Each structure stands twice: as C-alpha cells, then as structure tokens.
Design a protein with these regions (language model features):
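Accessory, non-ATPase domains that flank or precede helicase/AAA+ motor cores in DNA-metabolism machines
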Residues: 1-340, 347-349, 365-368, 390, ...
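Short amphipathic alpha-helix segments
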Residues: 547-549, 578-602
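Inter-lobe coupling/hinge segments of SF2-like helicase ATPases
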Residues: 163-191, 198-230, 236-239, 246, ...
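Short Gly/Thr-rich strand-loop-strand
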Residues: 598-614
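Short proline/glycine-enriched turn/loop segments at secondary-structure junctions
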Residues: 50, 561, 604-607
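Short, solvent-exposed loop/turn elements at beta->coil junctions and helix N-caps
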Residues: 17-18, 259, 462-466, 602-607
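A general secondary-structure junction signal
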Residues: 63-65, 114, 376-378, 461, ...
Length: 673
C-alpha cells in the first residue's frame, strides 16, 4: 500500500452497499481520497463506484482502517453524501446478527433501521447541535407500580429479562385522558430507565397502542425526551425523530416493530407490548419479528428486556419454561368478572342464538350507566354468504372468490374481484336464495340499534377507527384489535362470534383468540361483567381464572411432540423444483456437539406459478448452521451462470435470463394456517 502525500498512511473505508443482491452482502474496501478524509467517518452515507457494473452505488461506511490485505489498487470513494453518522456500530452489529439468523442481507435490515435522508431536516438538526441547546433534564425517581415492592424496578436496574402479565384495567393519566393500564406500566418502566440516565425503547404493534403509551409518558416525562418512530409519519417527521435518537441525551423512543433498531447510545430497556400480535412480524425481508430482534439486542447490549401482555404467547412461554425469561404477575392480583354463556344453565337451548338472553340483559342494565363494548369477528355488513337451501358457500362466478354484502339492501359482490353477483344461483342445488352466514360490524350495529332504540351506536373497525369513547351510554361495535378505550372503562363487554373465531384453521388459533378476548376484557370498568358467548372448556377457564399463562404452558407439550413451533424452528424454501432440491440437499445432517438435534423436510408442495415450497423443521441448536447453508444456496443461485435468451423476431441473443427464484423465510408460521 502506497503512502499519501505528507507521509500519511492511506485510509481505507469498509463500506456496506445498499443492494438487494445477496452476493454483495459483505463489506467492500475503498480508498479514501485526501479531500474526503475528514468526512469519511464510520456510519456516514457515501457513494462508491462499482467496477463490474460501471455505475455508482450508495452505501454506508461501517469502519475505517489503515491496513488492508488487498495488494492491488483500490477504487476511491466517490462522495460522502452526509456527514452525519446515521449507522451506529451497535445498530450495524445488530443488523449483521439479525440477517445471519434469518439468512438475509444486512442491507435489508439497515433499510428498516435507517430512514431515508431528508436534507432540510438534517441541516436544521445540525444547526441545533451547533447551538449547544440542551434537552430537558429528568430528575424524578419513578417506580413501576402494581407489581409488589419494586420488583420490576430492580429487574430494570439489573438488566434482566421479564415476561410481565399486564394489569387488566384502564387508567386516567391526566384529566379526561384514559389509557389501558398496561400502557402506564410500560411508561413507568421507561421513565424509570430515563431517570437512571439511559434510553428506553418501547415497541408496539400499531398506532392505537402508540398513542396510549405516548399519553401515559406525557404525564411522566418532558415531551422533548419522547421520540416517536413510525412508518405512518411523514418522512420529514420520522427522520427528525431518528436524528434525535442519535443525540447523547437519554430519551424514550416509541414506535412500531422497526423501533427496535433505533440508535441508542446508552440503552437501558427494551419493552415490547403484545409480542404475539402479527403486526410485530416484519413483512419485508428478512421477515424477523420484534421479539427476536429484541432478544438479540438485549444479549448484545445487556439492557433490560420487558415483554408485557394480557395473554402470554407460547413463544414467550417457552422462554419462561427455559428460565431464560422471568415471569412477573400483578401484586395484588386483579381478576376481571368473566361470564362464559356456554357454562350457564340452559346453554344448550341458547346455543344457536348469536346473542343469548344473558348478554341482552347484561347490556341493557349496563347501558343505564355507560358504554357497552360488543366485539365481533368481522367488519362490514355480511362478510360471509351461503346458499339458503344447501348451505354451500356462495362463490363468485368470475374468480371463485367469496361473496359478501357491503350494506343493507345491497347486491352481493365478490370480495376479491368486486364483480356484482346480480343473478347469482347456487352451483350445487341451483337455488337463488342467499343466506347471511355471519354479521359484521355494520349489520350488528343495525340489529342492536333496533333492539336499543335511542341509544348511541358507534362502529370501530379498520375503515372507521375510533381510539376513545366518552363515558356516556353507547353501544360500541368493534372488531378485534379496534376496540376504543372508554373513559372509566366499559360497563359491560359482550364477546360474540367466539365459535366462528375458533373455526379458523391455524396452529395458533386458540392462543390468538385468547389474546383478542383478553385484550378486550381488560378494557372493562372494575367489576363490570364480560360475557363471552359460545366458548367453554379450557379457553373459558383461562379467562374466568385469568390464568392465560397456564393455557400457553399446556400447549407446549403437544407442540413438542408434534414438532411444531415454538418448540422447533421453521424455514420455508420456495423456488423451482431443481433449485429447491439443491438447497435441501446442501443442508447439514448434524452439527458437532448437537448430534441429538434433528432436521426434517416437509414437501416440496406446489406453490403456484411453476414454483414449489419445502418446509424445513429444525431444532434451535441447528439454527445457525441451517441459516448459513440456506444463505450459501441463495448466493450460489443468484450468481449462477445463466443462458442467453434468443429473440424470436431477429434470432439474436439479446439478454441474460435472470437466475431462478429462490426465496427463504425463517419462522414462517403462516404456512400452518
């Protein structure tokens, strides 16, 4: 390596490229020209040349060094596009670990962690930093209440991992502002961390949960110490909040699943609410859940980790069983008043009633005092239709999609292609009569509005979200997850369509329903009844005794015997038959030191479009080896030699055929639905 002018040693920048190509998932060495030497710091955005492609690529400097093994001439950095080190070493190490666990690319994880640059926002932030203005100081000494004598406080201070059972109640954090009691617990834990001079990250499923936590935090800590990172934010607001996270001052960072990648110089706590919510699973490559990222980051940083929920997931219960996570319950215990109609006298006679007399009478009495929540399975008017005579599901004649009715006196239409079924007839019995199998939020609201004339009816679902309702009498019809928080809590809760929810074919259907129902019941006022219709057995007992963790624990032996998650891990491999076969054959048979761990392959099965899908089940001890093997297969497939395509019109070879598809996804439980 030649020395620069002035006898300075050549500075080398190791750069991660922003590229979806798996073969580029490594660090590339570039020489730093003298003009860029002061700006080329680890974490900054750069532009670099790609010799093979003859173009300029974007990337980040991960590290700089003055020693390099390469003996040839290195290409030079083309440009440092920003002097702000947005990719911190901690986040880079996290991205590398996460991508290796899921056989993905580190650049895909960095894309989730670092929002797009906003030049004006960045320049304004830099001017603020130069002004020397300091954020507010937080000098309080808060404690997490409701869990005995500082149990959670000591765990946060010691950096332990907790599975916290949330308190089923609502709480007024400021005059007229009510939130779930769980939000207060997370806010108190974050404030406790902030008071110790460390940063807290709070990861939540969606914007409804974020609003509750921010409201609870606002009553405890200064607003300028709260940063929100959310994909729903305008790009400028999100980038501004991200830059705040780069500052040295500790703060509370609140957001959705990607917030677990937020930069934090002195990280003291990661808190995750409702880890089993599917919104915690990243839909983009490498498809890693908030729970897994939080566990990795806690291991790397040594911070405290707090999982909170009303109903513990089987994934978390497995970690409790292994004593890797410590369970914490409310002290004193809080027991909601849950009434299952399936266990009441005369339940068999009322089994066919969607709303039995017990539920009607409970709602009527409760409406004299305040709002009543009615949870239903589906939005819309009549989301499921069938033949009135033979009960065959009604299907679209164009695409075979399910038919639905969007409103009263509307014509059935396809839920997939939108085709109107004006002259529908049953293909099985030729009947033209349609039966409304289920009632969605709109039809339920219509029926209850007639049953309780003069009562306010509020519909809350994905299309018409309501985050809060006041304490005045009202019927609130909501789908699962869209229930508003009522001032003072609901005076009664009716959980309808329980049998229909449980009829969904899925490995996790029982624990999902338990989670949906538990979250709704937790919105009740003290001693208010929660009526669950048509559900009995172990699920009803878990709700009545408020012992959801026992149900989760009882699931694990069966999952272990059947080799289902979370007792084993899954990976799906999708591609053309020969490509999938090559990837499967390359898997290791065993790993030294873990000879008892096993790998088994299910399939391949047809995945449509000429592709097949194989499912790999493997023990946790084999996870790293399986990920490395599949990652190698992805790279080989991506870099394999391809044949030229010949133009039929001219007979000339015009382009290269792209490599065959090979997609790998770890911990994909959707295939079990």
């Amino acid at each position: 390596m030649t020395a620069q002018a002035g006898h300075e040693q050549q500075l080398i920048a190791r750069v991660m490229l922003e590229s979806p190509l798996p073969q580029l998932d490594r660090l590339f060495d570039y020489a730093v020209p003298a003009a860029l030497r002061e700006q080329a710091r680890p974490g900054v955005r750069v532009k670099v040349p790609l010799r093979s492609a003859g173009r300029i690529a974007r990337g980040y400097i991960v590290e700089t060094t003055e020693a390099v093994e390469f003996s040839g001439t290195l290409s030079e950095l083309d440009e440092v596009t920003s002097s702000v080190p947005v990719l911190t070493p901690e986040v880079w190490n996290l991205a590398r670990r996460v991508s290796e666990r899921a056989a993905g690319s580190a650049s895909d994880v960095v894309r989730l962690a670092v929002p797009p640059r906003q030049v004006r926002v960045e320049k304004a932030w830099q001017l603020e930093q130069q002004s020397g203005e300091q954020p507010s100081r937080y000098s309080a000494n808060p404690s997490v209440t409701g869990y005995g004598d500082r149990v959670i406080d000591s765990a946060i201070d010691a950096g332990r991992r907790l599975a916290v059972a949330a308190i089923p109640a609502v709480h007024e954090v400021s005059p007229g502002v009510w939130v779930g009691r769980w939000a207060v617990t997370l806010a108190e834990a974050a404030a406790r961390t902030l008071a110790s001079g460390r940063t807290a990250i709070v990861a939540l499923p969606d914007y409804r949960d974020q609003q509750q936590v921010v409201q609870a935090l606002s009553a405890l800590v200064p607003l300028d110490l709260i940063s929100q990172l959310d994909a729903r934010q305008p790009n400028a607001d999100r980038y501004r909040a991200f830059l705040r996270c780069l500052e040295d001052a500790p703060r509370v960072i609140v957001g959705n699943r990607s917030v677990v990648y937020a930069p934090a110089g002195r990280l003291g706590l990661i808190a995750v609410w409702d880890d089993a919510d599917p919104l915690h699973t990243e839909p983009l490559s490498p498809y890693v859940s908030t729970r897994d990222v939080a566990l990795i980051r806690q291991e790397q940083s040594g911070c405290a980790l707090l999982f909170a929920s009303h109903s513990r997931s089987t994934w978390l219960e497995r970690l409790v069983e292994l004593a890797y996570v410590t369970p914490v319950a409310p002290d004193p215990a809080v027991l909601p008043h849950v009434v299952p109609t399936a266990d009441q006298p005369g339940a068999e006679a009322a089994a066919h009633a969607r709303i039995p007399s017990t539920a009607w009478n409970t709602a009527r009495r409760a409406l004299e005092d305040g709002p009543v929540l009615v949870q239903v399975a589906r939005p819309g008017y009549a989301p499921v239709l069938a033949c009135q005579d033979c009960r065959t599901p009604a299907r679209c004649r164009v695409c075979e999609g399910a038919l639905r009715i969007g409103g009263a006196r509307q014509t059935p239409a396809c839920d997939l292609c939108g085709a109107i079924a004006a002259d529908w007839h049953c293909r099985h019995c030729e009947s033209t009569r349609i039966r409304l199998v289920t009632a969605g939020t709109a039809r339920t609201a219509e029926e209850l509005g007639r049953a309780f004339p003069g009562t306010r009816v509020i519909v809350s679902d994905g299309e018409r979200p309501h985050l809060t309702v006041d304490a005045k009498p009202a019927l609130v019809i909501a789908t699962r997850g869209a229930e508003p928080v009522a001032a003072g809590g609901y005076r009664a809760i009716l959980l309808l369509d329980g049998e229909r929810m449980l009829a969904r074919e899925s490995l996790t259907v029982a624990e999902d329903c338990l989670r949906w129902w538990s979250n709704a019941i937790a919105l009740a006022a003290p001693r208010a009844p929660a009526i669950i219709v048509g559900v009995g057995g172990a699920l009803a007992r878990a709700l009545v005794t408020w012992s959801q963790q026992r149900f989760s624990a009882a699931e694990l032996p069966d999952r272990r015997a059947l080799r289902f998650p979370p007792m084993v891990r899954l990976a799906t491999v999708t591609g053309r038959a020969e490509t999938v076969e090559q990837a499967i054959c390359a898997l290791p048979d065993s790993v030294d030191g873990h000879e008892s761990a096993t790998i088994d392959v299910l399939g391949p099965v047809d995945a449509g479009d000429g592709l097949v899908r194989a499912t790999i089940r493997f023990d946790y001890a084999l996870g790293a080896e399986v990920a490395r093997s599949l990652r190698s297969s992805i790279i080989r497939n991506s870099t394999g030699r391809t044949k030229r395509q010949t133009s039929k019109a001219t007979g000339t070879k015009t382009s290269f055929r792209p490599p065959p598809v090979l997609r790998v996804r770890f911990d994909d439980t959707e295939i079990l639905e």
